[in-house]
């Protein structure tokens, strides 16, 4: 099946801020890494994006007044109808450049384009507009 890596999906639905350059401060209390003392650290990548999106979906469920269930059908309908809150990402790529043994290497990635693409999925979201739209669409 296309898009499946092993037993899991390998393609995006939505993109969120995952850059470690804009990481979020988080307080840990020995939850993930028992050998580390409690304290502040940073979260980025999926460790930031997944809970951020989950929180936004929770706000939509709260606004709807009930659980939303599987939101993918609503998400794809919202994107297809250009609903407020779903923002198409049309520029950028995820190519990666690094140096090793004095040589520069470029690992080509995917490029953003109008509509669905393999770098940002349907795009990103504007939470203030997305929450009420998802509450209606998944209702």
Sequence positions of predicted segments:
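Extracellular protease catalytic domains of secreted zymogens
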Residues: 1-139
């Amino acid at each position: 099946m296309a898009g499946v890596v092993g037993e899991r999906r390998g393609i995006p639905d939505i993109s969120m801020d995952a850059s470690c350059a804009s990481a979020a401060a988080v307080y840990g209390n020995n939850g993930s890494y028992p050998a580390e003392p409690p304290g502040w650290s940073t979260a980025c990548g999926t460790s930031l994006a997944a809970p951020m999106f989950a929180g936004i979906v929770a706000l939509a469920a709260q606004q709807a007044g009930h659980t939303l269930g599987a939101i993918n059908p609503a998400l794809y309908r919202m994107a297809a109808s250009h609903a407020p809150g779903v923002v198409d990402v049309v520029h950028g790529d995820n190519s990666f450049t690094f140096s090793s043994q004095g040589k520069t290497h470029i690992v080509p990635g995917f490029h953003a384009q109008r509509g669905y693409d393999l770098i940002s999925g349907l795009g990103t979201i504007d939470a203030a507009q997305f929450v009420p739209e998802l509450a209606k669409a998944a209702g």
